[in-house]
Amino acid sequence: MKLTCMMIVAVLFLTAWTFVTAITSNGLENLFPKAHHEMKNPEASKLNKRCVPYEGPCNWLTQNCCDATCVVFWCL
């Protein structure tokens, strides 16, 4: 009985995981071309660039904020 319940939970979890990854598959499709481009041109890699955290001073020309938008020289 316990094994049957564990199998049912595992199948439900894997089914949910499949649906979640299917929704975000567009992000995965673009992963490899970007990585290939970065291998050809290491300077284009985002790992080499430093970003400014939220509410830090930024450059509005280069938009160097990590997860925000540069507004009036501040990452917001």
Swiss-Prot record:
A Pfam entry, by short name: Conotoxin
Any one GO MF annotation of this record: ion channel inhibitor activity
Compartments where found: Secreted
Keyword Amino-acid biosynthesis: no
Entry superkingdom: Eukaryota
Keyword Aminoacyl-tRNA synthetase: no
Segment forming the signal sequence: 1-22
Key words of the record: Calcium channel impairing toxin, Cleavage on pair of basic residues, Disulfide bond, Ion channel impairing toxin, Knottin, Neurotoxin, Presynaptic neurotoxin, Secreted, Signal, Toxin, Voltage-gated calcium channel impairing toxin
Cleaved propeptide residues: 23-48
Main location: secreted
Disulfide bonds: 51-66, 58-70, 65-75
GO cellular component terms listed in the entry, alphabetical order: extracellular region; host cell presynaptic membrane
Summary of the tissues where the protein is detected: Expressed by the venom duct.
InterPro entries, A to Z: Conotoxin, Conotoxin_omega-typ_CS
Family listed: Belongs to the conotoxin O1 superfamily.
Comment field on protein domains: The presence of a 'disulfide through disulfide knot' structurally defines this protein as a knottin. The cysteine framework is VI/VII (C-C-CC-C-C).
Reported function: Omega-conotoxins act at presynaptic membranes, they bind and block voltage-gated calcium channels (Cav).
Record protein name field: Omega-conotoxin-like TxO5
